């Protein structure tokens, strides 16, 4: 049984790594895979299972931090200075990168404020299967609208051309995505695209902006609940973290490589299919009624 439970922990880490930064809602997938199927709360206990999810989320966040490590060093003015993307060598030599620490801070402010004010309320009242399905569906529609609009934009901007106003508006959409199932990356990438960034630029800024705020949020949650960690459960935490980190690295790099080509609509369609599947399990078979 111990081996089976370890495998379940690895599976949850893999799911977290695949979905945390993809625009598909990691919350929706964790409800489907864990709460409706694997039920980590049964072999870890409800409190320890909650802490386990914080740990594997940190694995995904560290993966994103590693992928963007050079960007973070540049934003903090550590290491070599690079130049803005441009049409020719002269442009690249003459224009320093515009993305800086203030862009990131401006983008973090709305979600940071709402998180401090409403985090407990959201955790207590909005984490249910129906609310997650609503978030998945509405988020999918928003992504489709963004993609349809982006097709009309002739010269979308790169991440180094982002303005402080654009950063703030994208930050507001990150705050809206606190609704479970909406998806932080789905919301912010869509908003970035609507603000005339290209899909890769919107994704880059989304991940760069998300890393510090998620590190802070997960770190604070871990400090609150670290006493729930049992020595016997440590192997689950380690394997889950490593699975989330490793799979997260691959998923993030693959996503960033493909997003300008495939856009958001395939993810939106997937989300709608996921809503239908969860609805069948929930309303048709009563699975997850206690969540």
Swiss-Prot record:
Q: Tell me which positions the record assigns to the signal sequence.
A: none
A cellular component term from Gene Ontology for this protein is:
plasma membrane
Task: Return the InterPro entries for the record.
Answer: UppP
Keyword Transmembrane helix recorded = yes
Hydrolase keyword on record: yes
EC numbers listed for it are 3.6.1.27
Q: What class of enzyme is it?
A: hydrolase
User: PANTHER family recorded for this chain?
Assistant: UNDECAPRENYL-DIPHOSPHATASE (PTHR30622:SF3)
Q: What does this protein do?
A: Catalyzes the dephosphorylation of undecaprenyl diphosphate (UPP). Confers resistance to bacitracin.
What the record says about family reads: Belongs to the UppP family.
Name of the protein:
Undecaprenyl-diphosphatase
Query: What is the organism of origin for this protein?
Result: Staphylococcus aureus (strain NCTC 8325 / PS 47)
The protein's gene is named: uppP
